[in-house]
Amino acid sequence: MNNQNKYGVYVDSLLSKKVVLKITEIGKNIKQNLEKKIKNSIEGKCITEGFVRPNSLQVKTYSCGLVKDDHIEFIVVYKCDICNPVKGFEVECKVRNITKAGIHAEVKDQEDNVPITIFVARDHNYENKQFDTIEKDAIIGVRIIGMRFELNDPSITAIAYLLGK
C-alpha cells in the first residue's frame, strides 16, 4: 500500500445520548459519573455509528437534569473515536489464520484493540498469484468490499479483496 494514502481507521465523532443517574450519583462529580456510565455501555463495542475505540470518550456538555421519580435524566454530548469503514476502504491487517475458504485477518490499532476482523475469500482472489504465498502473521493490504456489525458486537466483520504489492 502507498504510505501517502494511509489513514487511521478511526474518525472523531460528536454524539449525544440520554443518560440516567440515580439521585445518589449526583454531586460534584456529575461529569465523571456521566462519562463512566457512557464508557461502560459503549466503549470497545459496536453502536449504530460503528466500533467505539476504548479510552477515547470525553464528555463535552450535558443538560441540566430532568427529575423523574428516583433518577435524573441528562442529555450528554460526548466525543469519541469511531471506526466504520466504507466499501472501497483500504487497510493493512495481520493474518490470524488461513483456511481452504480464505484468510482470516485482524486490523489492530496502537492499543491492540481489534476494531475490524476481515475475511479474504479465496474465491474472490482466484487470479491473484500472491494469495497462495501469504503465511500466518503476515501483514497484508486489503480493500473492503462489504461489512456488517450488530449492536454490542466486539468488532466489525468485513469481507475484502487482497491488494497486490
Predicted regions and their residues:
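Single-stranded RNA-binding regions, centering on S1/OB-family and related RNA-binding modules
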Residues: M1-K165
